[in-house]
Amino acid sequence: MMDVNSSGRPDLYGHLRSLILPEVGRRLQDLSPDGGAHSVVSSWMPHLLSGFPEVTASPAPTWDAPPDNVSGCGEQINYGRVEKVVIGSILTLITLLTIAGNCLVVISVCFVKKLRQPSNYLIVSLALADLSVAVAVMPFVSVTDLIGGKWIFGHFFCNVFIAMDVMCCTASIMTLCVISIDRYLGITRPLTYPVRQNGKCMAKMILSVWLLSASITLPPLFGWAQNVNDDKVCLISQDFGYTIYSTAVAFYIPMSVMLFMYYQIYKAARKSAAKHKFSGFPRVQPESVISLNGVVKLQKEVEECANLSRLLKHERKNISIFKREQKAATTLGIIVGAFTVCWLPFFLLSTARPFICGTSCSCIPLWVERTCLWLGYANSLINPFIYAFFNRDLRTTYRSLLQCQYRNINRKLSAAGMHEALKLAERPERSEFVLQNCDHCGKKGHDT
């Protein structure tokens, strides 16, 4: 049987020594029967041994146990002090800004009278979902990332953390979907939908969103698909069926609905833009010019002025509808675009991971997973600022709250609303021209 050295490898050189050296000694004894062979062997032995390289014991490679910086399911990263400071500062800033922005939304809608409208209840639900992500999820992910990806909060809290993460993020995404439907119905059914858009209807929609979000959270807690959880890793279940179900309900279906709603609003805005074209003043009929009686001629002119006045009123109404549709299309387009950019990479990765890595762990590089995850969390940061940018009342309320001017908020909003109404009431130049002509015609008719 071949010898094995201390490193666990076959000792080839030792085996050769055991075969060659006795044979050399026996031949030397045959050549020197007078007993001088022993001295010859002794003198030549060091030279014979020197022809074979010395084998030193080396530690056997550890094939079963990974090194300290790698876990059995996913890698870990050892950051330097500077890297920890930079990463920690960025993650802390994202978390604090998310908390501040969504708190402003909740405070604004709840405490400002003008903003307490049923249509804004969905925005409050969205802000609460994003605020929950910032308070209950982001801090633990930040700590895990700063220590290199190792989960240190225990087995039980791993399940609680995953449940909170999935439910809050899903509620945020599905609320965005419901908001897009609400905006679409408000644009396409301006007469019937506002009547149904009361507080009770909004409460039912919000409750449905959170219950559906919980339906994705509960299966791993009741044994359908177990989360991946050991001493170092906390990962949502990688079961194939659960992965397809959760990603479809939480992202792919809401994204499809949002894209469809945006397309419908965009199409309505294009259709309204095609209709919104001033057709010009109607031509004066020959009988109104060539008339046997001047009174009949003036009467024709007065009727034409009245028709033009009604036409311009209808045009101003079309302008208002057109602007509202354009604003809704722009706002929803930016919301859908930001949502897709933030969450699409994460859900593509989450869907493909079980089919690439199997159901027991993740083989995706840690920095790729964390980058996609925090990109999705960033959607909770930008939502309040998107709505504030396109909503004048929210923007004014934000400014007043940040300046600690709490008592004057309702007064400022009322003044701003009055100013906006006066701007809309101003007539364009063509309207003034027609009214002046109508007044002139009326005076001439009265004089006649």
Swiss-Prot record:
Residues annotated as transmembrane: 87-111, 122-143, 156-181, 202-222, 241-263, 330-355, 367-390
Highest taxon of source: Eukaryota
GO cellular component: plasma membrane; synapse
Cytoplasmic side: 112-121, 182-201, 264-329, 391-448
Residues involved in serotonin binding: 165
GO biological process entries: adenylate cyclase-activating serotonin receptor signaling pathway; chemical synaptic transmission; circadian rhythm; smooth muscle contraction; vasoconstriction
Pfam families the UniProt entry points to: 7tm_1
Keyword tags: Cell membrane, Disulfide bond, G-protein coupled receptor, Glycoprotein, Lipoprotein, Membrane, Palmitate, Receptor, Transducer, Transmembrane, Transmembrane helix
Glycosylation sites: 5, 69
Topology class, membrane: Multi-pass membrane protein
UniProt xrefs under CDD domains: 7tmA_5-HT7 (cd15329)
GO molecular function: G protein-coupled serotonin receptor activity
Domain free text: Specificity for G(s) G alpha proteins is determined by the length of transmembrane regions 5 and 6 (TM5 and TM6).
Protein family membership: Belongs to the G-protein coupled receptor 1 family.
Function text: G-protein coupled receptor for 5-hydroxytryptamine (serotonin), a biogenic hormone that functions as a neurotransmitter, a hormone and a mitogen. Ligand binding causes a conformation change that triggers signaling via guanine nucleotide-binding proteins (G proteins) and modulates the activity of downstream effectors. HTR7 is coupled to G(s) G alpha proteins and mediates activation of adenylate cyclase activity.
Full protein name: 5-hydroxytryptamine receptor 7
